[in-house]
Amino acid sequence: MKIQNPALIRAVGVAGAFLVRRLVGTTEFHFRYADPTVNPEVARRTGARYIYAFYHEVLLFPAYFWAWPEMQILISDHRDGELIAQTVLRLGFGVVRGSTTRGGARALREMTGRVDRGHLCITPDGPKGPRRHVHQGLPYLALRTGLPIVGLGMAFSNPWRAKSWDKFAVPRPYGKATCVFPEPVIVPPDAGREVLEECRAEVERRMRKATDEAEEWVAKL
């Protein structure tokens, strides 16, 4: 059943944020960096800005660990996205509604306008997939903003999986989680369509490699 009542949606967001803090808060987190300066904690101190990209299925990882007001995240403007938006807003994220595909121009303009507030966060395979595919809007956003793209690989240990297009991961209590940061991808300021596609493919390649590494790592912990 679809929830349409705005007050009920807000209430679900409050409850969702509480559950995320309680559930994901029991997780033991591990991080690996190809370049330590892209660590959001370090960038927060130095004032550096990045576009952080992570797959839709592992949204609960950054939703808990990096829920800061300077993290501006793009959430789908589909009806289902409203519940996610209300939840991450109450966790502490800055929220932009839209996607890099459907209605993408408006969302990209608004994300570009948020650069002075902090980092930009994207689930590049959202809102409807294909799973672990990077859409073209991500390198275009990097072109517009001049920010490097850091495509993260994340994994939970033996998570519950939703029967959805992305196999959304819900961590089990007191489990472990890993995050691998590859080198950032920098989109040239004069990039045309062909170069943008090359950058898109490179981000996707690095994200898949980092995800494989994160999944292999968490299985050994």
Provide a role label for each language-model segment:
Residues 48-102, 161:
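Catalytic core of membrane glycerolipid acyltransferases/transacylases, capturing the structured
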Residues 1-24, 69, 86, 90, ...:
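Non-catalytic C-terminal accessory region of glycerolipid acyltransferases
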